[in-house]
């Protein structure tokens, strides 16, 4: 990846940005971007000339999580908040706002169905079970190496 990004730096004028890419893609100011499926869902909702592609070579799979620290002062309140967030109505509202696939299958089916907010939006329900997709687990040594290479790419 380092060599590919270095070569890209020499042949193109890439922009290494974060959330700014969402508006850039929505407004068709950029030709390609790496983004989370929820962000892509929102881009496609605003601009159907864009498309969502998961590479045949595989991609990383991510899962957002809600956790309660062991030393929490209010674990009961934290659990109530999580219960609220995963309630059907709030999952639906949250998914409509952020574009991320809800954990409740019935909410997903409603939003992705013919009368749903994200009908025929390929980014809303990303593929699952693809044999080349991975969930990455970084160790400190690998994280340091990746950070070093990324910094070299950005300063080229």
Question: How should these model regions be labeled?
Answer:
Residues 8-12, 29, 37, 44, ...:
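Sec/Tat-exported extracytoplasmic proteins
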Residues 69-130:
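Mature extracytoplasmic/periplasmic domains
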Residues 16-19, 27, 72-76, 88, ...:
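Soluble non-cytosolic domains of exported or imported proteins
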Residues 2-6, 22, 26, 34, ...:
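Non-transmembrane alpha-helical segments in soluble domains
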Residues 64-66:
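Short amphipathic alpha-helical segments
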Residues 48-60, 69-72:
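Short beta-strand->loop
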Residues 1-55:
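Ligand-binding pocket segment of bilobal, Venus flytrap-like solute-binding proteins
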